[in-house]
């Protein structure tokens, strides 16, 4: 009898152990599935969404596809870079494609105006009596480098530190300082409108992705604005 009880106890223990192992394995699979899903949310699905939403044809020759797709996602979905780096709200969207309007002016489908896409020229001025701040042209020039020919190292300097490499608006320091200078407390060495204090917290991988995407979009000559020749790109090679 005692042996029989021992056998039953051992059998019950084996069943309980098997169930516990099964539960543990199933839980592990669930965790792995959740981790895989989270990884995908930061991987291929975002890359594909980036390709889905880009409004312009892309030159992928010599480019890293994954970086281009992720860069498009950051630029077009997360950052809404075109909201500032186009000529302004009036021309940001194509005719009939402005989602802020109502029917029948808005036809129901958002359509970005490719003629002004990321080409800069939005006026954020005036500051004071004469100073106008214009968003920069982010498209590549005829060198193939974005932001009007910036190297990746220069791009990182802009994004991490807000450095205005064009030095468009110097600090007002002397009577002969040009009229487009910055009065204190503003620092003319830095970009004053761009949200670089937020962008500087991006990872190196994210900055690489943005740069790769901007390298893949078409060159846009940019708007012709008096006193702002720095907005224009040379597209002809």
Predicted regions and their residues:
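Bacterial N-terminal signal peptides that target proteins for export
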Residues: 2-14
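Bacterial N-terminal signal peptides
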Residues: 13-22
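Ser/Thr/Pro/Gly-rich low-complexity linker/stalk segments immediately outside membranes or between
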Residues: 28-37
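Surface-exposed intrinsically disordered loops and tails
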Residues: 43, 49-52, 91, 95-127, ...
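Electrostatic cytochrome c docking/interface patches
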Residues: 46-76
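The canonical Cys-X-X-Cys-His
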Residues: 71, 78-89, 155, 210-214
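Electron-transfer interface patches adjacent to heme c in soluble/periplasmic c-type cytochromes
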Residues: 79, 100-160, 164-168, 197-207
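A cross-kingdom feature marking solvent-exposed beta-strand/loop segments within repeated
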Residues: 178-201
């Amino acid at each position: 009898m005692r042996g029989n009880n021992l056998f039953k106890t051992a059998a019950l223990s084996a069943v309980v152990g098997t169930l516990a192992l099964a539960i543990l394995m199933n839980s592990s699979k669930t965790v792995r599935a959740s981790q895989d899903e989270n990884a995908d949310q930061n991987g291929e699905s975002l890359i594909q969404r980036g390709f889905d939403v880009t409004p312009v044809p892309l030159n992928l020759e010599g480019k890293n596809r994954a970086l281009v797709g992720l860069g498009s996602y950051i630029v077009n979905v997360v950052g809404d870079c075109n909201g500032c780096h186009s000529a302004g709200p009036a021309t940001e969207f194509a005719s009939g494609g402005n989602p802020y309007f109502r029917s029948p002016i808005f036809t129901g489908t958002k359509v970005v105006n490719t003629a002004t896409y990321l080409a800069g020229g939005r006026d954020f001025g005036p500051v004071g009596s004469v100073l106008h701040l214009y968003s920069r042209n982010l498209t590549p020039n005829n060198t193939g480098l974005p932001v009007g020919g910036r190297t990746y190292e220069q791009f990182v300097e802009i994004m991490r530190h807000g450095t205005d490499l064009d030095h468009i608006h110097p600090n007002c320091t002397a009577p002969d300082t040009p009229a487009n200078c910055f009065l204190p407390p503003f620092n003319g060495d830095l970009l004053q409108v761009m949200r670089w204090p937020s962008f500087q917290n991006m990872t190196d991988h994210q900055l690489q992705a943005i740069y790769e995407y901007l390298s893949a979009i078409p060159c846009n000559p940019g708007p012709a604005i008096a006193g702002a020749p720095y907005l224009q790109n040379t597209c002809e090679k």
